[in-house]
């Protein structure tokens, strides 16, 4: 394995990259020669990227195979994430898989940025797409497990009711940056009960539990780190509000108690995971509050 040419960097950065390289070599991992030209610039700019190369033995080959010249493609990203998550048999497996995917794609996004392959706009777009896809696929797995345990929530016509995850703030505007929390709201379209073997479970209870599991999968710090910090405080009634809210209750809240700042916040709201069609219907119901006619 050849050594990157980091000696042309300013002295302080050259020392930093040489230390990273020494630790990398000691780890016994290898990196494709095709990445060595950009490595000094990237590792000088990101301790995080250098650390990930020391932790993940397959990162270099994966990064090269990902075609760094191209921004993330939604279809291939979804396929990659879905394939890996399908192998998970427990919540611990799911957490490990999500964190591995997150770390690898964060490295890819930072590499493209620092190596001047992509620009700022492609970086924030890729970050937002990554968040959307990780959350949607994680939710799909958790929803399936929840339905296996307690049965599926159904609407009056017998169709499954799914959680709607609404993105707010920077994620809602597709402007997520490397240090952003993600602002979310959980909602569902129909109230009802799931008839179980022991006792009935309300849709509200089902979706609150599902939301808690999703937050735990994303936000909990494990040995592998975390996926995203989740902030739910923009939901109706803020921290004192229910974690998942029905469409009727949500519409009633904004009609009777919605404040001026909440109207501005809802401008960036968009359905980003779960039942996107139901989310679009919710947006239409809330539009009279957001865009009032005076």
Task: Describe the predicted segments one by one.
Residues 1-294:
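A nucleotide- and high-energy phosphate-metabolite-utilizing enzyme signature
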């Amino acid at each position: 394995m050849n050594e990157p040419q980091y000696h042309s960097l300013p002295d302080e950065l050259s020392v930093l990259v040489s230390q990273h390289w020494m630790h990398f070599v000691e780890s016994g991992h290898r990196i494709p020669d095709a990445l060595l030209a950009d490595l000094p610039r990237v590792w000088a700019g990101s301790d995080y990227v250098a650390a990930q190369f020391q932790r993940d033995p397959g990162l270099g080959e994966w990064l090269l195979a990902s075609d760094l010249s191209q921004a993330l493609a939604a279809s291939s990203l979804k396929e990659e994430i879905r394939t890996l998550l399908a192998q998970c048999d427990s919540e611990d497996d799911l957490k490990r898989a999500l964190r591995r995917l997150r770390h690898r794609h964060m490295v890819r996004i930072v590499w493209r940025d620092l190596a001047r392959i992509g620009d700022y706009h492609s970086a924030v777009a890729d970050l937002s797409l990554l968040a959307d896809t990780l959350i949607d696929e994680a939710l799909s797995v958790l929803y399936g497990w929840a339905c296996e345990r307690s049965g599926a929530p159904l609407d009056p016509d017998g169709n499954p009711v799914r959680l709607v995850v609404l993105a707010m703030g920077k994620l809602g505007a597709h402007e997520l940056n490397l240090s952003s929390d993600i602002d979310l709201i959980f909602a569902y379209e129909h109230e009802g009960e799931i008839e179980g073997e022991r006792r009935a479970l309300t849709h509200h209870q089902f979706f609150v539990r599902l939301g808690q599991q999703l937050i735990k999968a994303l936000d909990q710090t494990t040995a592998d780190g975390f996926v995203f910090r989740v902030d739910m405080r923009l939901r109706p009634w803020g921290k004192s509000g229910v974690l998942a809210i029905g469409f009727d209750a949500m519409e009633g809240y904004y009609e009777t108690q919605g404040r001026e700042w909440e109207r501005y916040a809802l401008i960036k709201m968009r359905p980003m995971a779960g039942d996107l069609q139901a989310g679009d219907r919710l947006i239409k119901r809330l539009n009279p509050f957001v865009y009032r006619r005076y």
